[in-house]
């Protein structure tokens, strides 16, 4: 079974070798879905981070400054993941390695 699967995967590139337009279309769809999922995940993560910081500040107001600093660092790291997804989407759209 593994040999058949390997053969199908290996020969798929020959079957779709001349379909440059189809690869471009799928690249646009993949970039849109990938960036949408990354933005959704980033927004959910940022919401949880802000909620946890507000909860921590409400429980201990003396740590508000430290929690705020930590929150901004966490938000920057979350946003960096979304920016990485944007870079990958732009590479898939404008410098597509599958088009040759």
Swiss-Prot record:
Q: Which Pfam families match?
A: ATP-synt_C (PF00137)
- InterPro entries, from UniProt? ATP_synth_csu_bac/chlpt (IPR005953), ATP_synth_F0_csu (IPR000454), ATP_synth_F0_csu_DDCD_BS (IPR020537), ATP_synth_F0_csu_sf (IPR038662), ATPase_proteolipid_c-like_dom (IPR002379), F/V-ATP_Csub_sf (IPR035921)
Compartments it resides in: Cell inner membrane
Molecular function per GO:
lipid binding; proton-transporting ATP synthase activity, rotational mechanism
Q: Which GO terms describe its cellular component?
A: plasma membrane; proton-transporting ATP synthase complex; proton-transporting two-sector ATPase complex, proton-transporting domain
Q: Does the keyword Transport apply?
A: yes
What are the entry keywords? ATP synthesis, Cell inner membrane, Cell membrane, CF(0), Hydrogen ion transport, Ion transport, Lipid-binding, Membrane, Transmembrane, Transmembrane helix, Transport
Please report the record's description of how this protein sits within the membrane.
Multi-pass membrane protein
The record's section on Gene3D superfamilies has: F1F0 ATP synthase subunit C
Site features described as Reversibly protonated during proton transport, chain residue numbers: 79
Membrane-spanning parts: 26-46, 71-91
Q: Which family does it belong to?
A: Belongs to the ATPase C chain family.
Self-association and partners: F-type ATPases have 2 components, F(1) - the catalytic core - and F(0) - the membrane proton channel. F(1) has five subunits: alpha(3), beta(3), gamma(1), delta(1), epsilon(1). F(0) has three main subunits: a(1), b(2) and c(10-14). The alpha and beta chains form an alternating ring which encloses part of the gamma chain. F(1) is attached to F(0) by a central stalk formed by the gamma and epsilon chains, while a peripheral stalk is formed by the delta and b chains.
Q: What does this protein do?
A: F(1)F(0) ATP synthase produces ATP from ADP in the presence of a proton or sodium gradient. F-type ATPases consist of two structural domains, F(1) containing the extramembraneous catalytic core and F(0) containing the membrane proton channel, linked together by a central stalk and a peripheral stalk. During catalysis, ATP synthesis in the catalytic domain of F(1) is coupled via a rotary mechanism of the central stalk subunits to proton translocation. Key component of the F(0) channel; it plays a direct role in translocation across the membrane. A homomeric c-ring of between 10-14 subunits forms the central stalk rotor element with the F(1) delta and epsilon subunits.
The protein in question is named: ATP synthase subunit c
Which organism is this entry from? Campylobacter fetus subsp. fetus (strain 82-40)
User: Lineage of the native species?
Assistant: Bacteria, Pseudomonadati, Campylobacterota, Epsilonproteobacteria, Campylobacterales
């Amino acid at each position: 079974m593994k040999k058949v699967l390997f053969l199908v995967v290996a020969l798929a590139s020959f079957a779709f070798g001349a379909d440059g337009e189809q690869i471009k279309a799928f690249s646009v769809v993949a970039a849109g879905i990938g960036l949408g999922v990354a933005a959704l995940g980033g927004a959910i993560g940022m919401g949880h981070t802000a909620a946890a910081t507000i909860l921590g500040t409400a429980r201990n107001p003396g740590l508000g400054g430290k929690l705020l600093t930590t929150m901004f660092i966490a938000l920057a790291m979350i946003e960096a993941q979304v920016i990485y997804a944007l870079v990958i989407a732009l590479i898939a759209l404008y410098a597509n390695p599958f088009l040759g």
